[in-house]
Amino acid sequence: MDGSTAAIILTLIVTYIIWFVSLRRSYKGPRVWPLVGSLPALITNAHRMHDFIADNLRMCGGTYQTCIFPIPFLAKKQGHVTVTCDPKNLEHILKTRFDNYPKGPSWQSVFHDLLGDGIFNSDGDTWRFQRKTAALEFTTRTLRQAMARWVDRAIKNRLVPILESARSRAEPIDLQDVLLRLTFDNICGLTFGKDPRTLSPEFPENGFAVAFDGATEATLQRFIMPEFIWKIRKWLRLGLEDDMSRSISHVDNYLSEIINTRKLELLGQQQDESRHDDLLSRFMKKKESYSDKYLKYVALNFILAGRDTSSVAMSWFFWLVSLNPRVEEKIINEICTILIKTRDTNVSKWTDEPLTFDEIDQLVYLKAALSETLRLYPSVPEDSKFVVANDVLPDGTFVPSGSNVTYSIYSVGRMKFIWGEDCLEFKPERWLEESRDEKCNQYKFVAFNAGPRICLGKDLAYLQMKSITASILLRHRLTVAPGHRVEQKMSLTLFMKFGLKMDVHKRDLTLPVEKVVNEMRKK
């Protein structure tokens, strides 16, 4: 190497160091290293990523910025990440400047093979059209009635017998797996009117469910590697990308068969419009003519949204309730109070039929406990947006175009400046305080998203969760199996890494009923 070459290399190194030192001064949060940025900290804390993000946000006052590619021309674009949990910033991103913060090209590229241009993977006019169409369906009472039928049937014919069997055998049961199967069957029934029956005593494997899980897992794997790498793996059909191709093919064939069958059924069913009230049939009955491809993406988008989120939330709910007997007692008392009014004091008849709409609606404390669960353990703990144009967040943070903003839903519920000194306590009562101004505080609780993209199925989710949790708690007392570890799985959805093994005990309602009756007499 001659002297001039060495001088050029040395000059480049010195120039980079000066540039990097200047760059690093602008960041707070995890340490940024030359060339590799904050990746070492992210890798070291991968097993506790959500708490790691929350720790950094706590130290930085609710917002920090970091760099994962400290390379000139990339550092302030693709390599630049803004992380926030400040409700003012969330309102700005999710509502005020909604059009400036779409899903973005990277997100859409990752999910396109599975979700296409469906409602959860699209932006702009494509999203607006689908949102408007879907919103009309989610506001109908008949869809709620359809959900209630699927849920009630599953509770009575499958969930109750399976839990009773586990109790009689004195064997722990993986409640997370049970709830995943239950909600998968329910959302498939509601979406395209077919029950895959994954929740059965034998816990069978279902081809569609296995293929859907495989495609979802492969999609999530794409998030942990650079885009060009997974695209090369896809082109070469390597590893999970090859599995994903087969899984999506299976899912595609399964849904094609359902769509073709439904078309024939709808043609021969002109007089009886009520026979098919699932979402797929509702879209097919509209005046607009939708392609089979579009209908498949409609189905897959709603299955992905409705399956894992509710089951994961209920898993964390039962774990939290098992650790907080005071909360469990208040839930039981509330259920007993309502059933005494609607079904008298004959407890043996309380479990003959699932709870009705009116009974479910009166479970205010149970809903508060579910909301409190979602505050601490949101089903989707982190979400991100792409920045279209340079912007300044309400807290003064500058965000450059081409960069990404991550809003930590998990962290929002764990900040003292948002929820007070007791923010880490499981306290359903905070949702019942009369002084709580829900309109002002809606960006303090974004488990169902917020702004124009707020979850259309929020009310259906609460209906399903309240029905299932009330039915279980009315019949059984659940405790975590001895030696079982409850740990978060690092994924886009907040699964429990080792499931939720629980012992099932018979619920004795004698004392709760006596207590409620005595209190009612005093009034």
Swiss-Prot record:
InterPro entries, A to Z: Cyt_P450 (IPR001128), Cyt_P450_CS (IPR017972), Cyt_P450_E_grp-I (IPR002401), Cyt_P450_sf (IPR036396)
PANTHER family named in the record: CYTOCHROME P450
GO cellular component, one term: membrane
Source organism (scientific name): Arabidopsis thaliana
Catalytic activity of the protein: an organic molecule + reduced [NADPH--hemoprotein reductase] + O2 = an alcohol + oxidized [NADPH--hemoprotein reductase] + H2O + H(+)
UniProt cross-references to PROSITE patterns, sorted A to Z: CYTOCHROME_P450 (PS00086)
Spans through the membrane: 3-23
Membrane topology label: Single-pass membrane protein
Domain of life: Eukaryota
Biological process annotations from GO: fatty acid metabolic process
Record-listed E.C. numbers: 1.14.14.1
Location, primary (coarse class): membrane
Name of the protein in its database record: Cytochrome P450 86A7
Family the UniProt entry places it in: Belongs to the cytochrome P450 family.
Keywords from the named record: Heme, Iron, Membrane, Metal-binding, Monooxygenase, Oxidoreductase, Transmembrane, Transmembrane helix
